[in-house]
Each structure stands twice: as structure tokens, then as C-alpha cells.
Swiss-Prot record:
Sites bearing Cysteine sulfenic acid (-SOH), chain numbering: 286
One Gene Ontology biological process: glycine betaine biosynthetic process from choline
Name recorded for this polypeptide: Betaine aldehyde dehydrogenase
Higher taxonomy: Bacteria, Pseudomonadati, Pseudomonadota, Gammaproteobacteria, Lysobacterales
Provenance organism: Xanthomonas euvesicatoria pv. vesicatoria (strain 85-10)
Annotated positions binding NAD(+): 150-152, 176-179, 230-233, 254, 286, 387
Residue positions binding K(+) 2: 246, 457, 460
């Protein structure tokens, strides 16, 4: 018997059943327990959501930016008031430790919504004189109805990252959460309605890609798609969106990010950063610094520091506040990670720790993989080239700065990069040469609301967060005004 009642679709400010009557199970990855049966949206449900969104968007866009901001700020207050309950639901659905979801997932999502509620009023056009009797002005107008497809690792945070700029700019959004972790997106829809968002302005359609995801990207009345997920799926989404109606797209995709530890680095600081860049959220973070480059002479000292820190990881029940490392999100994903680990062993990487599924006691019921560190890695190894999206750190050695940068850039990805050094001149020199959209110096992982985030190369298109993203949810209208009598040549 599932823990929760059937989860319906959220269309037009209320819960409705899927028209096709199909459902899918959502599982707690720490225990294998079925949490709920969730209704699977289809094309007919999408059409209903689009109709609802179009009606709601007209009402929403007619409000002043001040009025829209007040409603969004009420939603922020409700999110913060319900932080603990939402965090617990997120932990049940994702397997992430409660210590994480309480302090990061809802908190940072609410921060982004608050940011856009504040800057929405700064979305202004320009007035430019052309000559004595003529000028033009520009308007930033909402796109209309936009679609978004979320990932399973940060469900409510990603939903808010996508909804906040879209709604602040006057759009309506149809959001498809990952079918693996859809529960908190539905709660977010409730909160928006309670805060005063007009019906239809934020609809949630759980379901798989075949049943609703493709239909969302192809729908002719959806003006933009924002997608977070893997690069292979991103290519399909982009092709579908462009071939159907030339939709605009924003994509935050995969990564295989480098972390360069410089010869003058504080090795304790570098080890702390490497641990967070690989094992936070059990390694299920797109920006993870999974390729750690360390000077050859410092390899053994650095290995020792990493191994000492692995011993401090508290693996266990995600609902236990002492736990700092939980299961992977699903059995299928666990199997994929384990296959990559076996590939690393077969290709000659030296296993320092981990490398297996954890099955002691209650852990056997969940999808736990031990924190894994490989050393003696080479650039051609599969574990170094491919995104694993799990707790697998690959340690590589280098001899000089130019070599480190060249090898760090030798990837089709370009999402993130980091440098550890006390020398700021060196830090800037290296960062400016690294081909990545998000870079950190002597830190890792923070993405505050005002900071645009997104990738180079095959790690993404466009940006999330920051003022530029608000503008990306608008289209610019240019209007010329002639004050003198128009002179025709005919």
C-alpha cells in the first residue's frame, strides 16, 4: 500500500486525473517503498493545460509588475513556512539526506523566486531619439505560454529556477517534472495557487518523455522550452522544439568538470573542495568536479587527505539528520553507476576506496553505492570521459600548468570548472583559459540567484538565474514614433 494517495495532474489551479487513466509508481530509493501512484499525463492533458495556461496568462500579464511581485513574494513566504515539510517529502522521493534538503533545496529555490520578484520591476525598455522629430522605444513583452522539463536530482529547486523568471516576466508555465521525482513540484503548484497566482499560470504534468515530454516540446502554442537533463536527451528536445515551431530553448545539460589543484594549494582546502565536488548529494550533481587534477609530486599526500575525509562520511537513512550521504535515486541509475565503476577497474584505474554497492543491514533495501575514488586515471578512460552522475572521483596527475589546462579542456562538455590556489593572479589566468560556463576559485558548487549559470559546448544553451534569464523570457518589440509629417517618395 503506497504511503500517499494517488497523485493527480495540476491543471487550471486544481488537481485533475489523467484522461488516459494511466499511472506510474514513485519509489523511496532508500527503502524501495512505493510512495505513490502518480497519474501519467498525455497529449490530451497537455492540450487542456495549454488552454488553461493561455487564459491564465492573459490575466497574469495584465497585472502590473508590482502586483505580480506581491503574489510571488507571498509564495516565497509560504515556501519558507513549509520548508521542513517540503524538505522531508523531497528526501523521501530523492533519497537525499534531510540535512541537505532542509538547508539547500527549498531554501535556494525560494531565494531565486524572491530575487525575480524583486528584479521584475527593473524589466524596462529604452527610448532612443533618432532625430528632432522621431524616436523609437522598446518594450519587453512576455512570450506567452512556456514549457519546462525538470531533472530528478533537485526537483523543487529546478522547478523554481525555471518558474521564477518565467512568471516574473508575465508568462504562464507548463512544467513536466521528472517521472522519478515529481512529488514536490505538485506541492509547489498548490503554493502558487494559494499565493494568488491566477488559475492556469503554473500547471504540472507528471509523466514520461514518450507520453508528455515530446508532446510538450512539439506543441505549436508553446513559445519556449527550458530543459534540465542529460546531453543526449537535450539534443532530442532541441531538435523537436526547433523542428515543430522554432521554439526558443534553454538547456542545462551534462558535465565532466575539471578541478585543478595547483602546486601552491592548501591541500586540506583542496581535499575539502574535492569531496564536496564529488560526494555531495551522493554525486548526483551536474556541476560535479569529477576530474581532479593534482600535481604529480603531491598525488600521494592528496590521496591520503581524501581517504581520511571519506572516513567521515555518514552513510545511512536519509531521514536521520546525522546522515550526510544517501542512496542513488533509482535502481536503474545505481546499475548504470556500478557499470561505470567496473569499467574503471577493467581499464586499469587504481581503486582507492569504494567501488561497490553497499548492502549492510538496512542499506541493502536501498540503492546505495559507496563513495568511490580512482587514482592513476588517464584521459582516455571511460570514467574520465563520460558523465557518471554518481559518487565517483577520478584523480589525474599533471606536470605543468599548460598541460593541466589543455587536458581539462579536452572534453565535449563545458559546464563547470574550478581552481584551488592562494595566488589570485594564477587563479584568474587559469580560469580565463578554462572552457566552462560556471567557474569557482577556492570553493565549489554555490549558484546564487543573481549569478547566471549554464554551460559551454555540449553542456547547455542559454543561462538560468541572473537578470539575463528574466529578459530571455520576453520578446522585444520596437516602436518608432514620427512627430513630423511623413514624407513619401511617391
Amino acid at each position: 500500500m503506497p504511503r500517499f494517495s494517488d497523485q493527480l495532474l495540476y491543471i487550471g489551479g486544481r488537481y485533475v486525473p489523467a484522461r488516459g487513466g494511466h499511472t506510474f509508481e514513485v519509489v523511496n530509493p532508500a527503502t524501495g517503498e512505493v510512495l505513490a501512484n502518480v497519474h501519467n499525463a498525455g497529449a490530451d492533458d497537455l492540450d487542456a493545460a495549454v488552454d488553461s495556461a493561455q487564459a491564465g496568462q492573459r490575466q497574469w500579464a495584465a497585472l502590473t509588475t508590482v502586483e505580480r511581485s506581491r503574489i510571488l513574494l507571498r509564495a516565497v513566504a509560504l515556501l519558507r513556512e513549509r520548508n521542513d515539510a517540503l524538505a522531508e517529502l523531497e528526501t523521501l522521493n530523492t533519497g537525499k539526506p534531510l540535512s541537505e534538503t532542509r538547508s539547500v533545496d527549498v531554501v535556494t529555490g525560494a531565494d531565486v523566486l524572491e530575487y525575480y520578484a524583486g528584479v521584475a520591476q527593473a524589466l524596462q525598455g529604452a527610448q532612443v531619439p533618432l532625430r528632432e522629430g522621431s524616436f523609437f522605444y522598446t518594450r519587453h513583452e512576455p512570450l506567452g505560454v512556456v514549457g519546462a522539463i525538470g531533472a530528478w536530482n533537485y526537483p523543487i529547486q529546478i522547478a523554481l529556477w525555471k518558474a521564477a523568471p518565467a512568471l516574473a516576466a508575465g508568462n504562464a508555465m507548463i512544467f513536466k517534472p521528472s517521472e522519478v521525482t515529481p512529488l514536490t513540484a505538485l506541492k509547489l503548484a498548490e503554493i502558487f495557487t494559494e499565493a494568488g497566482l491566477p488559475d492556469g499560470v503554473f500547471n504540472v504534468l507528471p509523466g514520461d518523455g514518450a507520453s508528455v515530454g515530446t508532446a510538450l516540446t512539439e506543441h505549436p502554442q508553446i513559445e519556449k522550452i527550458s530543459f534540465t537533463g542529460g546531453t543526449a536527451t537535450g539534443r532530442k528536445v532541441m531538435a523537436s522544439a526547433s523542428s515543430s515551431s522554432l521554439k526558443e530553448v534553454t538547456m542545462e545539460l551534462g558535465g565532466k568538470s575539471p578541478l585543478i589543484v595547483c602546486a601552491d594549494a592548501d591541500l586540506d582546502l583542496a581535499a575539502d573542495i574535492a569531496m564536496m565536488a564529488n560526494f555531495y548529494s551522493s554525486g548526483q550533481v551536474c556541476t560535479n568536479g569529477t576530474r581532479v587534477f593534482v600535481p604529480r609530486a603531491l598525488r600521494h599526500a592528496f590521496e591520503a587527505r581524501l581517504l581520511a575525509r571519506v572516513q567521515r562520511i555518514h552513510i545511512g537513512d536519509p531521514l536521520d539528520e546525522r546522515t550526510t550521504f544517501g542512496p542513488l535515486v533509482s535502481a536503474a541509475h545505481m546499475q548504470r553507476v556500478l557499470e561505470h565503476i567496473e569499467q574503471g577497474k577493467a581499464e586499469g584505474a587504481r581503486l582507492l576506496c569504494g567501488g561497490e554497492r553497499l548492502q549492510d543491514g538496512a542499506l541493502a533495501q536501498g540503492y546505495y553505492v559507496a563513495p568511490t575514488i580512482f587514482s592513476d586515471c588517464t584521459d582516455v578512460m571511460t570514467i574520465v570521459r563520460e558523465e557518471i552522475f554518481g559518487p565517483v572521483l577520478s584523480l589525474l596527475t599533471y606536470d605543468d600548468e599548460d598541460e593541466a589546462v589543455t587536458r581539462a579542456n579536452a572534453t565535449t562538455y563545458g559546464l563547470a570548472a574550478g581552481v584551488v590556489t592562494p595566488d589570485l593572479a594564477r587563479a584568474h589566468r587559469l580560469i580565463h583559459r578554462l572552457e566552462a560556463g560556471i567557474c569557482w576559485v577556492n570553493t565549489w558548487g554555490e549558484s546564487p540567484a543573481p549569478m547566471p549559470v549554464g554551460g559551454y559546448k555540449q553542456s547547455g544553451v542559454g543561462r538560468e538565474n541572473g537578470l539575463a534569464t528574466l529578459q530571455a523570457y520576453t520578446r522585444t518589440k520596437s516602436v518608432q514614433i514620427e512627430l513630423e509629417r511623413y514624407a513619401s517618395v511617391f
